[in-house]
Amino acid sequence: MGIFKEDLINFGNLIDTEVEVRLLPEDFKRVYPDLDFEFSDRLLRIKGKRKGLLFKRGFEFRGGQDEKRVYNVRGFETEDMGVYLPIISSEGVEELSRKEGMDTEGEHLKLSVFGVLKRSNIYRDIPDAFKDKLVITRYKVRDGYLSVYITVTK
């Protein structure tokens, strides 16, 4: 299901409607080129390389799914939205928290999906008047992709 410009014209009907946006590993690769994302049912693996003295060693972070744990930040110069992934394996958390768009909060990895969402075809089809009114309501880690559910706020 996608958002169409005709649907957005009727703004009142979209306020309570959730739209699923599927974000693929290739979409994440455009924003985080030095990381590999693997999605399986309720499990997200992020693979990367950490710098050593003479060589690079690989790491694999594993995060779970906390479906309702999302964040939406709206400000004068800042705009961000993302998900909180429960940390299953803490390997690589330090390296990931140094990257832009990722941070740790307690036992969760805070992962920004705004950059990935902005590069999606669905986001490009949304009229500019509604782009600043989008919020993430929940997410699901599925086999092969991350489902982000967005809605329009007043």
Over which residues does each language-model region extend?
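Extracellular/lumenal and peripheral-membrane lipid-interaction modules
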Residues: 1-154
